[in-house]
């Protein structure tokens, strides 16, 4: 039995401009090689681009994009009796949001375009409209979970 204390889960701090934890989570996910100022520059300029294109509040569009890309269920590989089963598992909202942010960023990195600002802005706009690469990934995950529904009784 471990004697170590269970660490208290820290919530992410809100960012300085939009006062949003979601924006800060997004900045930390964009981050590469410790260049946080560049990551925040990319996200803030993408938000300005969204405001310029839609004339709406960009933080609401970001929140809507993340909510629409958030999966409710995922699959985990479970080894039972010498064979691997893809078992559908419900996930917590925090985990779902972090997956959605990750999928939004990978989909925006795969896009063709001038730079990351425009690619991220377009991916967020598409996700808010229920299209785009991140939404496709979410639907694919839900399809896989539905296909493997028979193995749901192997839950963890």
UniProtKB/Swiss-Prot annotation:
Function as written in the Swiss-Prot or TrEMBL entry: One of the primary rRNA binding proteins, it binds directly to 16S rRNA where it nucleates assembly of the head domain of the 30S subunit.
Coiled coil (residue ranges): none
Name assigned to this protein: Small ribosomal subunit protein uS7c
GO biological process per UniProt: translation
Gene field: rps7
Organism: Chara vulgaris
Pfam families per the UniProt record, alphabetical: Ribosomal_S7 (PF00177)
Protein family membership: Belongs to the universal ribosomal protein uS7 family.
Assembly notes: Part of the 30S ribosomal subunit.
Cellular component aspect of the GO annotation: chloroplast; small ribosomal subunit
Predominant place of localization: plastid
InterPro entries linked to this entry: Ribosomal_uS7, Ribosomal_uS7_bac/org-type, Ribosomal_uS7_CS, Ribosomal_uS7_dom, Ribosomal_uS7_dom_sf
């Amino acid at each position: 039995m471990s004697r170590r204390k269970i660490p208290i889960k820290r919530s992410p701090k809100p960012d300085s401009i939009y006062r949003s934890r979601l924006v800060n989570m997004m900045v930390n996910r964009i981050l590469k090689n410790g260049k946080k100022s560049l990551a925040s520059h990319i996200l803030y300029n993408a938000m300005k681009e969204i405001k310029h294109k839609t004339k709406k509040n960009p933080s609401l569009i970001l929140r809507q994009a993340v909510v629409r890309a958030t999966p409710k269920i995922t699959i985990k590989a479970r080894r039972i009796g010498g064979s691997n089963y893809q078992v559908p598992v419900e996930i917590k909202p925090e985990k779902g949001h972090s997956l959605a942010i990750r999928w939004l960023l990978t989909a925006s990195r795969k896009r063709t375009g001038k730079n990351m600002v425009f690619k991220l802005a377009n991916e967020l706009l598409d996700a808010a409209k229920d299209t785009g690469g991140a939404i496709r990934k979410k639907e694919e995950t839900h399809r896989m979970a539905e296909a493997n529904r028979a193995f749901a009784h192997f839950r963890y």
